[in-house]
């Protein structure tokens, strides 16, 4: 890469000499920038190509073709689109015109991002905005002095007074319905009394008010639903209590006879084979649970007598028996570990010894005991042989005498 092209990033005054050969080749008839000979070569890959376009002049801006509407035309358009507040505000005040004008002039493109072009664009935009504000002020003065506007406001006030009341639509007693009905007819007056220059703010205020009213109505409906639910539940509870009282006052003999049979049900939680083998604490728990079950059976005789025994109750009984057997197995395993710990001298006094430690110490103790056994057996064999030798010698001495 030549040195002259590398200096283009640091100083923009040398752009005419350093960048021109990459776009304008040597021509004797049209020599615009008086470039040097021998520099006609394509641009390097690392060269910033988009900076070259800053040297090109920007074309003149075309004038705006949009014409401003008169007051009568604006009022006619408002009367056509009276149902939609957003459309009314957009046609009366033309709030989005300045934004669309700015977006149409300032084009975000690398071809028009030069410093001189940006300055010209800012100047044109400021002039157009100033002329636009002046035209709007004239429209405000014309509309305030116009009689059509006053008659239109009168028509709106009469139409607002003829609106249907919310009590006709919502027959339920609402706490804040009067407040909402008072706020509703004053909305169009507030929207139209504001000048056209503040159309966006008035539109947003009206939308906010509508949203607040909708939220209030939803909250009121939710409160009504909650109140209705409370009333229904209270009535159901009262009916249920009355039914229970009537059943308790006038019990039938057939139901009492069947309940007497259901009191002798078998307790699946306590097996006769394993009841006496359980520890005292577990036995007390089972007895207390059985007493609680019997008391609950006595309290709810009618419901248990009328409803037959289902598969769910059988599953619960099976699960209960399984839990009892599992507790017994765990207790037996724990007791066996405690007994093994007491037999090992290294862990006998350690009550908090883990099961792994107990097993390791037990294996070590077994190996040591096996070695002692072999040693003692060898000593025993030696002593036996020695005793035999002594007996044989004793016999020899006796025979010699």
From Swiss-Prot:
Residues 233-247 have a biased composition (Basic and acidic residues). SUPFAM superfamilies: HLH, helix-loop-helix DNA-binding domain. Residues 376-397 are annotated as: Leucine-zipper. Coiled coil: none annotated. PROSITE patterns: BHLH. It comes from the Eukaryota. Residues 205-230 have a biased composition (Acidic residues). It holds the Pfam family Myc_N. GO terms for molecular function: DNA binding; DNA-binding transcription factor activity, RNA polymerase II-specific; protein dimerization activity. Glycans are attached at residue 58. CDD domains: bHLHzip_c-Myc (cd11458). A motif (9aaTAD) lies at residues 76-84. Keywords: Activator, DNA-binding, Glycoprotein, Nucleus, Transcription, Transcription regulation. The 9aaTAD motif is a transactivation domain present in a large number of yeast and animal transcription factors. Transcription factor that binds DNA in a non-specific manner, yet also specifically recognizes the core sequence 5'-CAC[GA]TG-3'. Activates the transcription of growth-related genes. This is Transcriptional regulator Myc-2.
């Amino acid at each position: 890469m030549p040195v002259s092209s590398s200096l283009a990033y640091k100083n923009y005054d040398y752009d005419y000499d350093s960048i021109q050969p990459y776009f304008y080749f040597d021509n004797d008839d049209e020599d615009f920038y008086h470039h040097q000979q021998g520099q006609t070569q394509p641009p390097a890959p690392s060269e910033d190509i988009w900076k070259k376009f800053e040297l090109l002049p920007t074309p003149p801006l075309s004038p705006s073709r949009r014409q401003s509407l008169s007051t009568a035309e604006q009022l006619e358009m408002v009367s056509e689109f009276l149902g939609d507040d957003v459309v009314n505000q957009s046609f009366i005040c033309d709030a989005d015109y300045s934004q669309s004008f700015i977006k149409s002039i300032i084009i975000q493109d690398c071809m028009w991002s030069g410093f001189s072009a940006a300055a010209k664009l800012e100047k044109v935009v400021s002039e157009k905005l100033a002329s636009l504000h002046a035209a709007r002020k004239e429209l405000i003065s014309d509309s305030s002095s116009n009689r059509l506007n006053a008659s239109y406001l009168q028509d709106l006030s009469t139409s607002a007074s003829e609106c249907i009341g919310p009590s006709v639509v919502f027959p339920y007693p609402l706490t804040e319905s009067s407040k909402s009905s008072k706020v509703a007819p004053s909305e169009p007056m507030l929207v139209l009394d504001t000048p056209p220059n503040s159309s966006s703010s008035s539109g947003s205020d009206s939308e906010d008010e509508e949203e607040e009213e909708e939220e209030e109505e939803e909250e009121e409906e939710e409160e009504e639903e909650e109140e209705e639910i409370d009333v229904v539940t209270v009535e159901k509870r009262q009916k249920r209590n009355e039914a229970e009282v009537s059943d308790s006052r006038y019990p039938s003999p057939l139901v009492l006879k069947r309940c007497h049979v259901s009191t002798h049900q078998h307790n699946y939680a306590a097996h006769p084979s394993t009841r006496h083998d359980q520890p005292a604490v577990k036995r007390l728990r089972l007895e207390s649970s059985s007493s609680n079950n019997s008391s609950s059976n006595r309290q709810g005789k009618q419901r248990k007598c009328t409803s037959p025994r289902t598969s769910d109750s059988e599953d619960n009984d099976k699960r209960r028996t399984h839990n009892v057997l599992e507790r017994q197995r765990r207790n037996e395993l724990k007791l066996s570990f405690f007994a093994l710990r007491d037999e090992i001298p290294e862990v006998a006094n350690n009550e908090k010894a883990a099961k792994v430690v107990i097993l390791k110490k037990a294996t070590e103790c077994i190996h040591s005991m096996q070695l002692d056994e072999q040693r003692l057996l060898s000593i025993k064999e030696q002593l036996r042989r020695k005793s035999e030798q002594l007996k044989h010698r004793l016999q020899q001495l006796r025979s010699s005498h």
